[in-house]
Amino acid sequence: MLGCSSLSIRTTDDKSLFARTMDFTMEPDSKVIIVPRNYGIRLLEKENVVINNSYAFVGMGSTDITSPVLYDGVNEKGLMGAMLYYATFATYADEPKKGTTGINPVYVISQVLGNCVTVDDVIEKLTSYTLLNEANIILGFAPPLHYTFTDASGESIVIEPDKTGITIHRKTIGVMTNSPGYEWHQTNLRAYIGVTPNPPQDIMMGDLDLTPFGQGAGGLGLPGDFTPSARFLRVAYWKKYTEKAKNETEGVTNLFHILSSVNIPKGVVLTNEGKTDYTIYTSAMCAQSKNYYFKLYDNSRISAVSLMAENLNSQDLITFEWDRKQDIKQLNQVNVMS
């Protein structure tokens, strides 16, 4: 299983931010990647068709196959996006539909970030493609995916490949997880509109005065498991009621706090094969600064890469390896016994 949760927020100083978790049973050889302008990105593995990208972008991904595969990222125009698992619902074609171009599902994020500015551009681009059932070389199959994008205006969309083609959800609440589709998750929210940060009122039963045991009773009923539907509800609830950030730093802090509600420790979620599904990394990004932030399962320090600090016309990819060592700040002197 490859899980994932994502959300977008807006700060009071009009910064648009996006964040996601990456939950998986294996760690691909991932790193932070800056793809410069005109680098050239494939559409398919089986055909040597390369599209030069107009815009540079940064995000988390892999360089283990022919073209860089990004799982999420932000481009120089402030468009942000991510791929998320869409098991049993994603539908891919065997051949391109008439008038469209075939694309491997894992290259969608790279192609979109490399060539789009707004969510309107994303919709136009993706409706010109047919997502093909072409296996990923590393996984050995075409992973079932859906996609979410947020632009500098703050609008978030969800793109889902299904039996009817591509379904586009506009003006979403800016939250997404995994299967089922976005519309189902949005409808499911209606069953939880009574969940609130406010404490319930005391009530009388005869002469008995009943009071809550403590703070937080207004959240009773919010599910605590790790299913996609439960994670969607928790992220939506935390997003709605978390105090609004004043600036980018506060926004990034809020994003990591909100997504901590769906972080999965090793051993808590197991597959049918007994493998552990866990949160490998959590990332956040800002449309205005083009900064990309992340922290790892093994190292909870927030690291950052600034897209605009690099040569965006470079001929080569710019990569940043993971530092997996836990970064603990020691506040007093440690005596080493001789």
UniProtKB/Swiss-Prot annotation:
pH-linked activity: Optimum pH is 6.0. Is very stable at pH 6.0-7.0.
Mutagenesis or variant effect for residue 178 to A: Loss of activity towards penicillin V. The precursor is partially processed
Coiled coil: none
Disulfide bonds: none
EC number(s) recorded for this UniProt protein: 3.5.1.11
Outcome (variant: residue 63 to S): Slightly improves the specific activity. Has little impact on the substrate affinity, but exhibits 12.3-fold increase in catalytic efficiency
Keywords for the protein's UniProt record, in alphabetical order: Antibiotic resistance, Hydrolase, Zymogen
Molecular-function GO terms, alphabetical: penicillin amidase activity
Domain of life: Bacteria
Catalysed reactions, semicolon-separated: a penicillin + H2O = 6-aminopenicillanate + a carboxylate
Subunit structure: Homotetramer.
Family membership: Belongs to the peptidase C59 family.
Protein name (database record): Penicillin V acylase
Native source organism of the sequence: Lysinibacillus sphaericus
